[in-house]
């Protein structure tokens, strides 16, 4: 509805009513205009009517939605199912062109605009979350692992001699396989135990750089967000090493946007040293479906190079999901979620601490990890290994997702590399433990229900252990009685034989 349409409507309905409707529409259009002008996340979230109006206006700019369109190419945005078309708000052409994921498509102005706005909003949120000097970023329709691979492949052209990636160990398969998939040899740097925490071995990293030679190292691949007792890598010190030796630095920041501590580490690393790109997951940080990531960095031209490395067009779904989410929340809504996550972390920490003490266990002291917590399972592990894994199974069958039990001595082979003590980020962690994390969107009732179910599971495992111990004791006692009876029989037999002779 434009001005002429409203004027025509005044001949059918009272002009006063039409003008009122026109003003109501203008309030929606005002929000859309501010978004296009500023390219920033609105402070307050939009309602669904504004969002749907905006998406509809964008969609009708794509050629597949033109009323008189005649498509004779091999890819004309045709969709067989109306349900599929509605699911995607009729954005069918995707984003980017064959040479650049950020390029504008001539036949899809609306989808191209959607892509640009989504990238702009995400950049604004990254700054809001703590990385104030980030220069550029883009949404890529791949999860974190493949997005890291794209970064490594972009660096390959800059460093033709390189064949190694230095990687402080974190027991998570996708980030390890991202290096293998890119065709490089991971050089695993074992972590060092400091108290309960597993921290970056900076001396080992620098020694390996000197041993292999900077020209033969593609990059250092560090990590922020991780499962306790591992903590975020020493990003500032690693960034200085990278700057001193002229080595690129790629950071796996999978679920770090929600943590001010992780974002501060990235900001400081870029300030004192070198960070080329940092990658974060969309689903873990923005509560959207799995399948998207954000590649960001402090050098605009390098981030553009990564975008140009992506082959072909790409799905617009992750960009659409995060755009809708951020416009619904607004910057104030996202800030509120970050604040609530911090509060839930403290609450979860206190509740696990109380429960662990009730079972003669303890909450591991990992102050450098702002998201994940770990509780020892020493008393279970002392009896036998099966009790630890049994606890994990019991939690899962009771609909507790996300909690991990980590037994001692687990061995796992990933892409031909064998890791001892897999899941614990080190070969020989002192004890078995259970992980839980306070991620964005967690509510107090989630924590309370988890603690209640964990308590029940621990009681059940302890009860079973006690029963097994009693059974074993009874069996041992029976064997002892049988042995004593046999000895007594032998003594009596010897006595009888002596008397007979």
Curated annotation (Swiss-Prot):
Cofactor(s) the protein requires to work: pyridoxal 5'-phosphate
Any one GO molecular-function label of the UniProt entry: tRNA binding
Pfam families: SepSecS
Keyword tRNA-binding in record: yes
EC number: 2.9.1.2
Modification sites for Phosphoserine: 14
Annotated region described as Phosphate loop (P-loop), given as residue ranges: 96-106
Phylogenetic lineage: Eukaryota, Metazoa, Chordata, Craniata, Vertebrata
Protein name: O-phosphoseryl-tRNA(Sec) selenium transferase
Cross-referenced Gene3D superfamilies: Type I PLP-dependent aspartate aminotransferase-like (Major domain)
Record-listed pyridoxal 5'-phosphate binding positions: 75
Region (Tetramerization): 1-44
Residues where tRNA binds: 271, 398, 463
Annotated substrate binding sites: 97-98, 105, 313
Subcellular location per the Swiss-Prot or TrEMBL entry: Cytoplasm
